[in-house]
Regions:
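Conserved N-terminal glycine/acidic-rich loop preference
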Residues: 121-124, 147-185, 192, 196-241
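Solvent-exposed loop/turn segments at secondary-structure junctions
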Residues: 47-50, 88-94, 128-132, 197-201, ...
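Catalytic His-Asp segment of secreted/periplasmic serine-dependent ester chemistry enzymes
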Residues: 196-295
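Sec-exported extracytoplasmic/periplasmic mature domains
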Residues: 75-79, 101, 116-120, 177-187, ...
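Conserved SGNH/GDSL esterase-like catalytic core that processes O-acyl groups on lipids
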Residues: 57-173
Length: 295
């Protein structure tokens, strides 16, 4: 997701090896099972993966990567053989597969260039910028006390057409094609599509976060719909989907500051508005590492 410019002045988650010995030879030494070979890991994605404003910022400045983002957490936990993080704030699907990304640090290569036949593990978080998720959320901000004339859900679903749902339907085939392109580059790689989390609880928490209840529910339901589309594409294109909504329930932008996995409109943690916090990145990284170890 892009770092939004908000009008109030803010710019903008071993396998246990049991050794079995023969009953007839209780004293025989049983060799340890060989450890899994270290993985060659590549991380692709947008700012939901890169970690803007989370200390310490590393890599290309224009991509706003943190050394505490979930790819770094995964790499450390799995003790990978090699690790390449090409996640970049503002990325859209085309920046992964075909079009260099323009940033404040200059054009960045297509992210897929980092994937090779030797790559064993790929994580990817993409889609939020494709459908304008953050800009939609920013457009729903209001400091009015009444919902009259201030419900962006009504505007975004005017005439019976849900524009966000339409954008998801339009972009979903491209997500599948992107996964095919990754698999073509790394035929033996395990590909994990990492979804977007629970940013808002039911009804939100207006005015603590300046999104009216109807709009909070609309935004989160749109995130859920995008996740479902990403999951479907993953399943249809030989990848796996990592659900981060469930693990982030109770850790949304309305949670206590030290419990947030996603930062609010006015940041109270070192993270970009409406983006993961360091705690969120740690939780997401833990979940991914656990999934990789389990199979």
């Amino acid at each position: 997701m892009r770092n939004p410019g908000i009008y109030v002045g803010i710019a903008v988650a071993v396998s246990l090896l049991a050794a079995c010995s023969s009953p007839s030879a209780p004293d025989a030494d049983v060799p340890d099972a060989p450890a899994s070979a270290p993985l060659n890991y590549v991380a692709l994605g947008d700012s939901a993966a890169s970690g803007p404003r989370i200390p310490e910022q590393v890599g290309v400045p224009g991509c706003e990567q943190s050394d505490s983002n979930y790819p770094h957490v995964v790499a450390a936990q799995l003790e990978v053989a090699s690790f390449v993080d090409v996640t970049c704030g503002g990325a859209v699907t085309e920046n992964l597969v075909s079009t260099p990304q323009s940033t404040s640090s200059g054009d960045q290569p297509v992210q897929l260039d980092a994937v090779t036949p030797e790559t064993d593990l790929v994580t990817v978080t993409i889609g939020g910028n494709d459908i304008g998720l953050v800009s939609t959320a920013v457009g729903c901000l209001t400091f009015a006390n009444s919902s009259t004339g201030n419900v962006c859900k009504d505007r975004l679903t005017a005439g019976g057409v849900d524009t966000v749902a339409a954008a998801i339907a339009d972009k979903a085939p491209g997500w599948g094609a992107m996964l095919d392109a990754v698999a073509e580059r790394a035929p033996d790689a395990r590909i994990l599509v990492v979804g977007y989390g629970t940013y808002l609880p039911d009804g939100g928490c207006f005015p603590t976060q300046p999104v009216l209840p109807e709009d909070a529910d609309y935004i989160q339901s749109s995130i859920t719909a995008m996740n479902q589309a990403l999951k479907t594409q993953a399943e249809e294109h030989g990848a796996e989907f990592v659900d981060t909504e469930a693990l982030s329930v109770g850790h949304d932008v309305c949670a206590a500051v030290d419990q947030r996995y996603f930062e609010g409109v006015i940041p109270e943690n070192p993270a970009a508005p409406l983006h993961p916090t360091a705690a969120g990145m740690a939780a997401i990284g833990d979940e991914i590492a656990s999934i990789v170890r389990s199979e």
